[in-house]
């Protein structure tokens, strides 16, 4: 039942600021704390993308002056073409503080990020993730765009420009995603 006297939670979604790298890193580490590297790999991805100028879209969720979520998008290469030349991007990582999850904050970051990609003239986006979660945004498994070594049902694609030809082949993310 709706309670008109319940407090309203205001969350602002916006571009990251140059001074927020450490705070974003803390959000990422907390969100991925249960992963094998405790979120340090995901944090290094974002820090390196930022340092390399390859962080095409980087959004934060803020509540009461505190960062509670983050999403990053960077150019990918498909079928051996130069990175970014096809205007396709990879979404990774998406992070929301554990105590703020299941409140549509991640969904808001994804939707806002996809809108930002469209404004950049992006043709599509790929990600490795849960098909049940990402289907709500239009992502689906794609047999023609593949990420080698990953079960195809978890590698998802979304065309953002249906007038452009859809590329096919193996996807390569920025080098930081592929540790040696």
Predicted regions: what they are:
Residues 1-9, 131, 135-180:
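Terminal substrate-recognition subdomain of acyl/acetyltransferases
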Residues 91, 96, 102-115, 127:
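Conserved acetyl-CoA-binding loop-helix of GNAT-fold acetyltransferases
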């Amino acid at each position: 039942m709706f309670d008109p006297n319940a407090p309203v939670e205001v969350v602002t979604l916006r571009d990251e600021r140059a001074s927020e790298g450490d705070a974003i890193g803390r959000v990422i580490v907390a969100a991925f704390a249960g992963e094998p590297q405790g979120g340090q790999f995901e944090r290094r991805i974002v820090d390196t993308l930022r340092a390399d100028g390859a962080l095409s879209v980087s959004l934060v969720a803020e509540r009461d002056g505190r960062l509670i979520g983050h999403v990053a998008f960077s150019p990918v290469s498909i079928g051996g073409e130069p990175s970014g030349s096809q205007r396709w991007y990879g979404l990774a990582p998406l992070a929301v503080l554990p105590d703020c999850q299941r409140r549509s904050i991640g969904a808001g970051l994804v939707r806002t990020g996809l809108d930002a990609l469209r404004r950049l003239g992006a043709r599509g986006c790929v990600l490795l993730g849960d098909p049940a979660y990402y289907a709500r945004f239009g992502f689906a498994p794609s047999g023609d765009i593949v990420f080698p070594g990953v079960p195809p049902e978890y590698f998802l694609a979304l065309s953002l420009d249906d007038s452009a030809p859809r590329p096919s082949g193996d996807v390569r993310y920025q080098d930081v995603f592929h540790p040696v």
